[in-house]
Regions:
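Residues forming the flavin
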Residues: 1-133
Length: 133
């Protein structure tokens, strides 16, 4: 994902390109993929959330309005807080997993991954509930 589709102050999809095009510097238009919901599960860099905030001058649902950045490792706190940070951070954009930790400024978690599974389940459940409305 190199960008998002942003219309009416809502994230409406993603803009993607493929590696050979980028590697060879080919002048090929990227693909636009429309979506009712976009999930940033890009990990420690939270690339989609960072792009949305940077390019559109908006405030995310965080203490600072931007991507706070993950804190140093604390396995116990990280396991709980990755689930708590899993949420919709801007209309049409959810975060889960380590992207949720990076966006919310919570600790990374180390080698125990129960929180990652619970984060994935939570984001799926929230999206299903939203789409049913």
């Amino acid at each position: 994902v190199e960008d998002v589709i942003f219309k009416n102050n809502t994230v409406n999809g993603v803009v993607v390109n493929w590696t050979p095009v980028l590697r060879e510097g080919m002048h090929v238009d990227p693909l636009n993929i429309l979506a009712k919901i976009v999930v940033d599960g890009t990990g420690h860099d939270s690339e989609i959330a960072a792009t949305v905030a940077r390019k559109n001058g908006i405030r995310l649902a965080t203490e600072t309005g931007g991507v706070i950045g993950e804190r140093s490792l604390d396995v116990v706190a990280g396991e709980d807080e990755v689930v708590n940070g899993t949420k919709e951070i801007y209309p049409g954009l959810y975060v889960c997993g380590m992207a949720a930790s990076a966006v919310s400024g919570t600790p990374r978690m180390g080698p125990i991954f129960g929180g990652m599974l619970m984060s994935g389940k939570k984001v799926a459940d929230e999206i299903i509930a939203k789409l049913k409305k």
